[in-house]
């Protein structure tokens, strides 16, 4: 595969220095192996369900999951933009949105293997930290808290990326921890199986600590603190709430609370959290009990353009996105991120995939870096400045949806970004819905630990 005829617009890197490194984060590739440009709108892609796909193109459609051509182009665009990243984060969801009976265990494993082989082909010498998504199992979502065939088979597929200890851990529960590459050896990546906490997972309902992952995570973070390491935490299903509707949480509440406790206790060694699942571009702030910002989670957009069927979400498609982070190799401090995207409509018309820069975080939100304090400032601006809110809203769908983010939209996004806990999220929805007055959102953002009912 070559890039002949491709138009990829490269961005100048904003930070210079010997300690600056870069890494890719990709998520939610969702390959639909049966995608075809058919004259019959009901035969284009199984992932569209019963919806007719009227204008399918070679690079995909907003009603469908990714054709192979789209995923292939995304990986080769990554190689063209930054061929030698320090490492790659890959946070899962590889299979299409189709019923369980349309897949099966063998098909799930075949898709994971196909995408694994593509990444190895394009980046043969790059370390990859990979997590399973809720669609990377059969039946989907039903991840067990103990060893099983899929964990064992995926561990074999990912064996070149795993140490002996990680290989054994993955087979037990699909989570592991690895040192970061490079001479400093001052950091590590923790890969979580948060599918164990998913509210749709009946296998772990009623368990206090599925697979003892929380206990293990606490031990890893405590050891990192003792050893002077900083940590990146990655996974697929994030805690908190979906920002494109109201009251849609992913974790069971008890697991959500436990995750928050871990972050609050160990936030000083966590240099960043990186998740997917939403297909959208957003972030989540974490605060201590005094209201001080202590950590941030980045939600990377998906490669799949698939329009979600989640109740309450209006026109929930997105353009395909890929993301690169700039970081300090010595401290793991995040300096910036750049999101690249494919305008799918344009690509299908031109029959050429033009991956281009969508935005650079420091420029978009007028902040010095991608640190916790900077992301808190970004949230403040999103909450209080309409033009920044609108800019964020367009980026949230990877420049697919250019409609105006009105009051109800603002409530959904600000409360979801600011409040990962169930109780404070509910309070935020109530307060913002009842009291949308100038300055009120800014007060809420600057004082996140306050209960809205106390400031009314």
UniProtKB/Swiss-Prot annotation:
Domain of life per record: Eukaryota
Top EC class of this enzyme: hydrolase
Subcellular location: Secreted; Cell membrane
Disulfide bonds: 45-64, 405-409, 415-428
CDD domains, A to Z: MPP_ASMase
UniProt entry keywords in alphabetical sequence: Cell membrane, Disulfide bond, Glycoprotein, Glycosidase, GPI-anchor, Hydrolase, Immunity, Inflammatory response, Innate immunity, Lipid degradation, Lipid metabolism, Lipoprotein, Membrane, Metal-binding, Secreted, Signal, Zinc
Keyword Signal attributed: yes
Co-factor(s): Zn(2+)
Glycosylation sites per record: 34, 72, 100, 164, 223
Binding site for Zn(2+) 1: 28, 30, 93, 279
EC assignment: 3.1.4.-
Cofactor note: Binds 2 Zn(2+) ions per subunit.
Residues of the signal peptide: 1-18
Binding-site list for Zn(2+) 2: 93, 134, 236, 277
UniProt topology in membrane: Lipid-anchor; GPI-anchor
Gene disruption: observed consequences: Mice display higher inflammatory responses in models of TLR-dependent peritonitis. Macrophages show enhanced responsiveness to TLR stimulation and a significant change in membrane fluidity and the global cellular lipid composition.
GO molecular function: hydrolase activity, acting on glycosyl bonds; phosphoric diester hydrolase activity; sphingomyelin phosphodiesterase activity; zinc ion binding
Family under the similarity heading: Belongs to the acid sphingomyelinase family.
Oligomeric form and interacting partners: Interacts with TLR4, TLR7, TLR8 and TLR9.
Name this polypeptide is given: Acid sphingomyelinase-like phosphodiesterase 3b
Gene that produces this protein: Smpdl3b
């Amino acid at each position: 595969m070559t890039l002949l005829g491709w138009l990829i617009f490269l961005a100048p890197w904003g930070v210079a220095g010997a300690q600056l490194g870069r890494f890719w984060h990709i998520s939610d590739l969702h390959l639909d192996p049966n995608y075809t440009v058919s004259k019959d709108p009901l035969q284009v892609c199984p992932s569209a369900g019963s919806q007719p796909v009227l204008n399918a193109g070679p690079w995909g459609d907003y009603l469908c999951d990714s054709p192979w051509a789209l995923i292939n182009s995304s990986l080769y665009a990554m190689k063209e933009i930054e061929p030698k990243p320090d490492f790659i984060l890959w946070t899962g969801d590889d299979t299409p949105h189709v019923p369980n009976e349309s897949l099966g265990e063998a098909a799930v494993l075949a898709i994971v293997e196909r995408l694994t082989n593509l990444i190895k082909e394009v980046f043969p010498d790059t370390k990859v930290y990979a997590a399973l998504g809720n669609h990377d199992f059969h039946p989907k979502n039903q991840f067990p808290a103990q060893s099983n065939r899929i964990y064992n088979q995926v561990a074999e597929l990912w064996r070149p990326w795993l140490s002996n200890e990680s290989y054994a851990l993955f087979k037990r529960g699909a989570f592991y921890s690895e040192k970061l590459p490079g001479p400093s050896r001052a950091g590590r990546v923790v890969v979580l199986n948060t599918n164990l906490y998913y509210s749709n997972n009946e296998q772990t309902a009623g368990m206090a600590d599925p697979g003892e992952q929380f206990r293990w995570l606490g031990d890893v973070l405590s050891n990192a603190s003792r050893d002077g390491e900083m940590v990146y935490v990655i996974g697929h299903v994030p805690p908190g709430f979906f920002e494109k509707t109201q009251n849609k949480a992913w974790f069971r509440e008890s697991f959500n609370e436990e995750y928050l406790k871990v972050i609050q206790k160990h936030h000083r060694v966590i240099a960043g959290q990186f998740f997917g699942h939403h297909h959208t571009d957003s972030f989540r702030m974490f605060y201590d009990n005094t209201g001080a910002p202590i950590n941030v989670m980045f939600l990377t957009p998906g490669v799949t353009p698939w329009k979600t069927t989640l109740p309450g979400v209006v026109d929930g498609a997105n353009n395909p996105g890929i993301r690169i982070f700039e970081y300090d190799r010595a401290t793991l401090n995040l300096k910036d991120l750049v999101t690249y995207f494919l305008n799918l409509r344009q690509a299908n018309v031109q029959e050429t995939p033009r991956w281009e820069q969508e935005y650079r975080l420091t420029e978009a939100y007028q902040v010095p870096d991608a640190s916790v304090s900077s992301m808190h400032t970004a949230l403040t601006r999103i909450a209080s400045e309409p033009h920044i809110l609108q800019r964020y809203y367009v980026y949230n769908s990877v420049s697919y949806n250019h409609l105006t983010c009105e009051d109800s939209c603002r409530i959904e996004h600000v409360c979801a970004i600011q409040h990962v806990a169930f109780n404070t999220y509910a309070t935020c929805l109530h307060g913002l819905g009842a009291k949308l007055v100038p300055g009120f959102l800014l007060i809420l953002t600057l004082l996140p630990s306050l209960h809205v009912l106390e400031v009314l």
